[in-house]
Amino acid sequence: MSTAYVYDGTLEGMLSCVFEAYASKEDPLDIVEESSFAPRLGQREKIVATDRNRARRVEEGLIRVCGREAYEAVGIVHCSDDPAKGRAILEFVRYAMKRGKGAWRDVAHKKVAAFAQMERAVRNEKHRWLQFLRFEQVEGGVYIARCNPEANVVALLMDWFSARFNTQDFVIYDEVRHIAGVSRGGSWIMVEAPVFDAAPATEEERVVAKAWKRFYDEVSIEARTNHGLRANFMPKRFWKNMTEMKQAPLREGSFEAGPAKGDGFGAGAVRVGKAALISGSPCSSARHRPKSCG
């Protein structure tokens, strides 16, 4: 009978599953988040509680034997939406603990191939959003950006943008997972955001957005227009939140204006409903956030 490990979806939880597999000498067929668990026929379910001490031991052991790059790769892969990521991480850790430093480079090895493919996909998704994410200033002085990524990369984006805009308050909202990264004063947190409303765009923002869209339209050379090539380099799933790709002129409150409440930013710039801190999101924990996430 096959076994499925079920955990809470955090990186600490995933590392706890790795520890459990070693401690119990089991080889679980699946390691899945509780929110998406669907057991196979006749499969035994084993709920693995998150244990930070166990997670820390796995982290420290992986860094000691395999190098920090291997641990950082685990953090990146855990941001994937692939349901097989848990099993891929376990197989990689087992191989890496035997192989030692450089194991994460053995991308052709059967124990590393799936892991490496997921890591590459997450890094590529992050890279695309670094290019195509667009911020909009709303009343209250906060900059808002929306995204619909194919991996849980908001925490990775927060590391990058917070390091560069450490004096600017901003929010990056994931429309797919209903979570938001909130940065203020150079530090940031991840919160659950089932409701996300923002104040209207500032007058300056509307002027700049209109100018940017006009520049984008005017700088193109009609005779060299190639819509297929553009869609290849800039997939259409990014377009709806890109200022230059909006068909109509920016209207006041291009983000849904709602009954704004004070949120610490001033002037009710952003409301995220009953926001709840995500203390163990894939890369949000101070201890478990890979440095390379930025």
Regions found by a protein language model. Give the residues of each.
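Cysteine-cluster motifs in flexible loop/terminal segments that predominantly coordinate metals
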Residues: C283-P290
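Short coil/turn segments at secondary-structure boundaries
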Residues: E72-V77, D106, E175-V176, T225-A231
